[in-house]
UniProtKB/Swiss-Prot annotation:
Keywords assigned by UniProt, alphabetized: ATP-binding, Kinase, Lipid A biosynthesis, Lipid biosynthesis, Lipid metabolism, Nucleotide-binding, Transferase
Alphabetized HAMAP family for the sequence: LpxK (MF_00409)
Species of the source: Haemophilus influenzae (strain ATCC 51907 / DSM 11121 / KW20 / Rd)
Function: Transfers the gamma-phosphate of ATP to the 4'-position of a tetraacyldisaccharide 1-phosphate intermediate (termed DS-1-P) to form tetraacyldisaccharide 1,4'-bis-phosphate (lipid IVA).
Organism lineage string: Bacteria, Pseudomonadati, Pseudomonadota, Gammaproteobacteria, Pasteurellales
Name the UniProt record assigns to this protein: Tetraacyldisaccharide 4'-kinase
Amino acid sequence: MPFWYSNSKLIWLLSPFSLLFWLISQLRRALFSLGLKSSYRAPKPVIIVGNLSVGGNGKTPVVVWLMEELKKRGLRVGVISRGYGSKSKTYPLFVTKNTNPIEGGDEPVLIAKRTNAPVVISPNRQQAIELLLSQAECDIIISDDGLQHYQLQRDLEIVVMDAERALGNGFVLPAGPLRELPSRLKSVDFVITNGGKNQYSDAVMRLVPHFAINLKTNEKRQLNEFQSGVAIAGIGNPQRFFTMLEKLGIQLKQTQAFQDHQHFEASQLEKLAENQPLFMTEKDAVKCQSFAKDNWWYVPVDAEIIEAEKQRENLPHFWAKIDKLVEQYRNG
C-alpha cells in the first residue's frame, strides 16, 4: 500500500487496528516462548528465510543463493514452504520442476526448477518436514518464509529487506507493512538488504540479470540485443523489475503490474505485445509456460551477496555459524 511509505492520515485511522494486531501477535509469540503452546523441533537444522514486512523484498533469490552455497559446501538441502497461492487439494505436496504452479505455487516451483532440490509445501510445516525427510536425504532444511510461524522451532533466522523501502512507516499491519515491530530484528541472525545498504544491513544483495530466455523455445539472448518491448510483473515490487530493464537500455513501450502471485490467462497478455517482445520475471514465467507465444521472454536473476561494509566480516561469521550448526546435529 502506498500510504505505508508516507505520512498519510490513513495511518492514524488504522493505528487502533495495528495495536490490536500487535497485541495478538505478541501474545501468540509469548505462548510459544513460554511453552504454553507446543512447537515442533525438526531432526535436522532449520534455517528460516523470511521478511519483517509484506511484499517484494527479494526472498526467493536469497533462498536460491543460500541453497547453491550450501550445496557447494557438500550439504544436501531441502526446502519447505507455506506454498502461498497454491490451490492443491491435498497437503503436504512434494513439488518438482514439472508441478503445475497452480497446485504447487509459483515460488516453490521456481525454486525446484532453479535448484533441482526437494521442495515440499504445506500450511503445516511439521507435515512438510516429515514428508521431505521421508522422500529425500537432507543435511539441512530451509524454510521459505515462516519467520512468524512459531509452531516451527528454528536454528537460524535470515531476514530479507528492501533497502529503499526498509520498514516503511514503522507500523504493523494494517497501518503499516510490518508483521512484527522493528525491534524483532535484534533477535534475528542475519539481515540481507536488497538493492543497497541501510542501518540494518549485515550483507547487501544485488540482483544480476544475465540474459533473456524464450518461454516457448528456451532460446537464450543477451539483453543488449533488445532495444524495446513491453514488460509485465506479478511480484511484490513490480517497479523494481521495470527499472532493471530500463537500466539495461531496453525502452519499455508499456508496463503492466499485476498482483503478487497472479495466476495468468493467455487472454490477459496476448494483446499487450503482439508485435514486440514481452518481458516477464522468472516467477511469472513458470505460470505462463503452457500458453506462451513466440515473443515472450523471461529474465532470470542471480543474487550476489556481499558485505555491507568492507571492514566487516559478517559473511564469514554467518557461514561459521552454519558449519557449527550442522556439526552439532551430526554429533547428536
